[in-house]
Amino acid sequence: MTQDTSTYYVWIGGSCDYGHKERAGGAAVVIEHNGNIISRDVISDLHTTEFRMMLTLMIKVMLEIPEGSDILFLTNAAYIQNFDKTPTSKSANPDLIIQCIEEKKRHNSVGVKIVQYHKSPLLIETHDMATEAMAKTRKEYHQKNK
């Protein structure tokens, strides 16, 4: 993929462990701008999903990137393609989608591009970061609640 030097390319991935009763979810980003990695971030929580974590992190990224920017989120998670579509009564995470719609207004353009996971080393890195953060959150929870 040829990168435009003015666009912020945000690789975003998530992970969720549906097999545990406390169901931890996590999301991570690697942000590229002007051909360089400028930041990495990761979040995780209990009793959530990776999609909720990914939308939360998208909002955080849109708040942190300078107003008026061009942002392209790169992911293999088709779910987040609808981050800027008005939620319906059947939409999951309508609260976060509404926040995404609001934050998108601050920028020149914000989009999502679906990429192949196995061909995207930075996307693989985000998944690994999210999985690690999720495991840490779960471990801390169990240590506190022994």
Question: Where are each of the predicted segments found?
Answer:
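Intrinsically disordered, low-complexity segments enriched in small/polar residues
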Residues: S6-T7, V115, K139
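Short, surface-exposed, polar/charged, turn-prone segments marking secondary-structure boundaries
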Residues: N36-S39, I59, I98-E103, K139-K144
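Short, low-complexity, polar/charged sequence segments that are solvent-exposed and flexible
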Residues: A28-I31, S91-N93, T131-A135
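Charged phosphate-binding loop/patch that engages nucleotide di/tri-phosphates or the phosphate backbone
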Residues: I124-K146
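RNase H catalytic domain
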Residues: S15-K21, I59-H127
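RNase H-like nuclease fold core
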Residues: M1-R52, E64
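Short amphipathic alpha-helical face segments that pack within enzyme cores
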Residues: R52, T56-K60
